[in-house]
């Protein structure tokens, strides 16, 4: 059975799961009834950052227009433009054995595409979650339900995977940002 985490909790991934080399980071959400006339398009992204919490270059930003990190260590499986259906709406596959040595952390985020133009925000999103699944066994290792703590935010840092003592750990963040994808890019040291 998967471990259920709360905001701010940290847990070991690779030490307590020997042999874990590839993990599927599954993200899901529902949108509340909304009469704004536009569909919601939520997008998952991964920011691979160094010890200074910055991406070294644009290729360290994996998202719908850059589906794979050059190392092959992080792969976005594609953009789900509707978020309809049960289960994961988008997935990011992390192969810990291929992550370059200078990468200390992987920030997993979700943004709302064209949020400002469509008058959309995370206050209109419910049942958001992230889960980590062992790709080989398909066992769900952990789950973090984000709750309903958002109002005007258009981007969320959902979680971080980070190195500590030669192992990979998971940090349940759940921190909202205004300013969408551009604000997140600036947060991780990218020019927009």
Swiss-Prot record:
Xref: Gene3D superfamilies: sav2460 like domains
PANTHER family assigned: CAMP-BINDING PROTEIN 1-RELATED, TELLURIUM RESISTANCE PROTEIN TERD
Pfam families registered for this protein in UniProt: TerD
Protein name, UniProt field: Uncharacterized protein YceE
Database matches in InterPro entries: Stress/Tellurium_Resist, TerD
Family: Belongs to the CAPAB/TerDEXZ family.
Domain of life: Bacteria
Lineage: Bacteria, Bacillati, Bacillota, Bacilli, Bacillales
Organism from which the protein derives: Bacillus subtilis (strain 168)
């Amino acid at each position: 059975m998967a471990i259920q985490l709360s905001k701010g909790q940290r847990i070991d991934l690779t030490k307590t799961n020997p042999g874990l080399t590839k993990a599927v980071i599954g993200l899901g959400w529902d949108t509340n009834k909304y009469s704004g006339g536009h569909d919601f398009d939520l997008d998952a992204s991964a920011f691979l950052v160094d010890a200074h919490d910055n991406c070294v270059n644009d290729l360290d930003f994996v998202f719908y227009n850059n589906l794979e990190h050059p190392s092959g260590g992080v792969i976005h499986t594609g953009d789900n433009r509707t978020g309809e259906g049960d289960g994961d709406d988008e997935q990011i596959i992390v192969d810990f054995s291929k992550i370059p040595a200078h990468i200390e952390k992987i920030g997993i985020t979700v943004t709302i595409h064209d949020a400002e133009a469509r008058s959309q925000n995370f206050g209109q999103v419910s049942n958001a979650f992230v889960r980590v699944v062992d790709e080989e066994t398909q066992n769900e290792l952990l789950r973090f339900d984000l709750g309903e703590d958002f109002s005007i935010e258009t981007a969320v840092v959902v979680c971080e995977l980070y190195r500590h003592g030669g192992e990979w750990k998971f940090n349940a963040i759940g921190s909202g940002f205004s300013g969408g994808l551009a604000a997140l890019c600036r947060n991780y040291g990218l020019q927009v």
